[in-house]
From Swiss-Prot:
It is found in: Cell membrane. Signal peptide: none annotated. It catalyses: (S)-dihydroorotate + a quinone = orotate + a quinol. GO terms for biological process: 'de novo' pyrimidine nucleobase biosynthetic process; 'de novo' UMP biosynthetic process. This is Dihydroorotate dehydrogenase (quinone). GO terms for molecular function: dihydroorotate dehydrogenase (quinone) activity. The keyword Nucleus does not apply. PANTHER family: DIHYDROOROTATE DEHYDROGENASE (QUINONE), MITOCHONDRIAL (PTHR48109:SF4), DIHYDROOROTATE DEHYDROGENASE (QUINONE), MITOCHONDRIAL-RELATED (PTHR48109). It is a peripheral membrane protein. FMN binds at residues 61-65, 85, 138, 171, 216, 244, 267, 296, 317-318. Belongs to the dihydroorotate dehydrogenase family. Type 2 subfamily. It comes from the Bacteria. GO terms for cellular component: cytoplasm; plasma membrane. The gene is pyrD. It comes from Psychrobacter arcticus (strain DSM 17307 / VKM B-2377 / 273-4).
Length: 344
C-alpha cells in the first residue's frame, strides 16, 4: 500500500499511536523483505567528520528513540540513521497527549520529554541490528537530574555508547526537558563541553579509535549566542553541529487548532528560521566544523536550500510524516543534481 493511501487512515488516529503503528508496519514490511524492493538505495557518496556515507540524507533523532527499528528504517534509503535521544535511566517522558499535528501547516508540536527505555536498552538494539551504515546516537539527561549535574548524565551515556556509535550527538536543545536549553549558554556550555571532551579523549585512547562528537542546537538563538556557541565548538574541537532542533516560536501557526500547545514546533514553519541559523553558523565556522541541516525539509528543493546554506548533510523527520518515505530519494536526487550542476 502506498503512503498516500495510508496517510488519511493514520491521520485520523491519535498521533502517537499512529507513530507507533507506522513503525510497526515498516518493521513487518522489512521482515517480509519488501521495503528494499519498493524504495531501494540511491548512492551519493559523502565524506563527513572522517566517516563515509552512502548518501547525505539521514534520519533525525526522535523517530526511533530506542533503536528498535534501525534495519527497517535503513531500507528507506537513508545514508545514516540517528537514534535517541537516550538517557542514562529509562523514563516515561511527559504526560499524554504530547504530540499534535497541525495539518494545515504540515507541522508537528511535541512535548515528548525524552521518553525512552534507557541507554542500555538502546545499546542492545544497536548491537543486534544488521545495518552496516553509520549510526549516530543522540544522548541527553534524565529529567530528574538537576541541570547543574547534567554533565554527569552526558558523560555516563557517552561512556556507554562510545564503542557502538558512528558518531555521538549531544542534545542540549530540546525545549521539553526543564532548563535543558540553559546548557547552550555561558559557563554552563563551557563546563559541559569540557567534561564531555575530556572523557571523550580518554575513551578514544582506551578504545584505539575516534568517534566524532556532534552538538545539536535550537533555532531560537540570537546572533551573540551563535557567536558564542561557534567559538566553543572550535575551542573544544567538536566535530559537527546539527542545526536545528524544534522551535518555541509559533509564527504562522498561532491561529491553527492546537497551535498554542506547549512544546517544540517542527515541520514546514521551522524551515526558514532553521536555515537562517544554519547559515549563521556556516558563516562563523567557515568549514571548520561539519554541519548537518535539519528542520522543515519536505522536498528535494528544501534539502538543497540547506546545502546552499552550508550543510554537509541533512536529516529528515516531520517531512516524512507528511510526505512519506519517497521524500528520502527525492532529497538524495535533488542534492546530487545540485552538486552536478555546480561542477558543470
Amino acid at each position: 500500500m502506498s503512503y498516500a493511501l495510508l496517510r488519511p487512515f493514520l491521520f485520523n488516529m491519535d498521533p502517537e499511536h499512529a507513530h507507533e503503528m507506522t513503525l510497526s508496519l515498516l518493521d513487518k514490511a522489512h521482515k517480509a523483505r519488501v521495503l528494499g524492493l519498493v524504495y531501494g538505495q540511491s548512492m551519493q557518496p559523502t565524506d563527513c567528520m572522517g566517516l563515509q556515507f552512502s548518501n547525505p540524507v539521514g534520519l533525525a533523532a526522535g523517530l526511533d528513540k530506542n533503536g528498535d527499528y534501525i534495519d527497517a528504517l535503513a531500507e528507506l534509503g537513508f545514508g545514516f540513521i540517528e537514534v535517541g535521544t537516550v538517557t542514562p535511566k529509562p523514563q516515561v517522558g511527559n504526560d499524554r497527549p504530547r504530540l499534535f499535528r497541525l495539518k494545515q501547516a504540515d507541522a508537528i508540536i511535541n512535548r515528548m520529554g525524552f521518553n525512552n527505555e534507557g541507554v542500555d536498552y538502546l545499546i542492545e538494539n544497536v548491537k543486534r541490528c544488521k545495518y552496516k551504515g553509520n549510526i549516530g546516537i543522540n544522548i541527553g539527561k534524565n529529567a530528574a537530574t538537576p541541570v547543574e549535574q547534567a554533565a554527569d548524565d552526558y558523560v555516563y551515556c557517552l561512556e556507554r555508547v562510545y564503542p557502538h556509535a558512528s558518531y555521538i550527538t549531544v542534545n542540549i536543545s530540546s525545549p521539553n526537558t526543564k532548563n535543558l536549553r540553559d546548557l547552550q549558554s555561558g559557563e554552563a556550555l563551557t563546563h559541559l563541553l569540557d567534561a564531555i571532551k575530556n572523557r571523550h579523549s580518554q575513551l578514544a585512547t582506551e578504545y584505539g579509535f575516534y568517534v566524532p562528537l556532534v552538538l545539536k542546537v535550537a533555532p531560537d538563538l540570537d546572533p551573540l549566542q551563535v557567536d558564542y556557541i561557534s567559538q566553543q565548538l572550535l575551542d573544544f574541537e567538536i566535530d559537527g553541529l546539527i542545526a536545528t532542533n524544534t522551535t518555541l516560536s509559533r509564527v504562522g501557526v498561532e491561529d491553527l487548532p492546537d497551535g498554542d500547545q506547549a512544546g517544540g514546533l517542527s515541520g514546514r514553519p521551522v524551515s526558514h528560521i532553521s536555515t537562517q541559523i544554519l547559515q549563521q553558523f556556516s558563516d562563523q565556522l567557515d568549514g571548520k566544523v561539519a554541519l548537518i541541516g535539519v528542520g522543515g525539509i519536505d522536498s528535494g528543493a528544501k534539502a538543497v536550500k540547506k546545502i546552499e546554506a552550508g550543510a554537509d548533510m541533512v536529516q529528515l523527520y516531520s517531512g516524512l510524516i507528511y510526505k512519506g518515505p519517497g521524500l528520502v530519494q527525492s532529497c538524495i536526487q535533488s542534492i546530487g543534481g545540485y552538486y552536478d550542476a555546480m561542477e558543470n
